[in-house]
Amino acid sequence: MRPLYETKEHVERETALAMSIEAYGTAQVNKTVKLRKMPIKYGLDFAMVVGGRVIAFAELKCRKYSYAEIDSLGGYMLDLMKITRIIEHINNTGLPVHLFVELKGEVYHAKFTDKPKFKLVFGGRNDRDDWQDNGPMGLIPMSEFKKLDIVFRDQQPVAAE
């Protein structure tokens, strides 16, 4: 079985991001939006729930790179299996999948209602000495992302200034 590399810091950042997305979403639709963590078998992080009804799915990522740095690499790199899960959820439910990415305190969002636009490359990370960290990846153009009025400081969400 493959090890999980999720650290306490990662979980804290993801939790803070989820809380801020809930607050942002609630303000946008004027209804209480809850992000409910899904079991790992679903392949995506959260179900977005309003009034007990699943209205969408969400994947949350926290990265230590800036928008410009990721853009210079050709886009946001997402494992092909994750892209496959996004497509499956869209096709099987008819619901959108939202990708939220926190980059150095700024939050970006891409909404997928169909197959995401991406360039297929072979890549990954090489800092953990795990050969399974490399494989087919989708580079999603940063032009697919919209910056949200959510700002992170010291891992705590605050309203944008």
Task: Cite the ranges covered by each PLM segment.
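Acidic-basic catalytic patches of nuclease active cores, encompassing PD-(D/E)XK
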Residues: 1-38
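Non-catalytic C-terminal interaction segments of nucleic acid-processing enzymes
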Residues: 5, 9, 20-23, 52, ...
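Acidic carboxylate-rich catalytic motifs and surrounding loops in phosphoryl-/glycosyl-chemistry enzymes
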Residues: 37-39, 99-106
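Conserved catalytic cores of phosphodiester-cleaving nucleases, focusing on short active-site segments
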Residues: 46-48, 52-68
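Mg2+/Mn2+-dependent nuclease catalytic core
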Residues: 63-85
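Acidic, metal/cofactor-coordinating or nucleic-acid-engaging core segments within structured domains
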Residues: 83, 87-100, 109-112
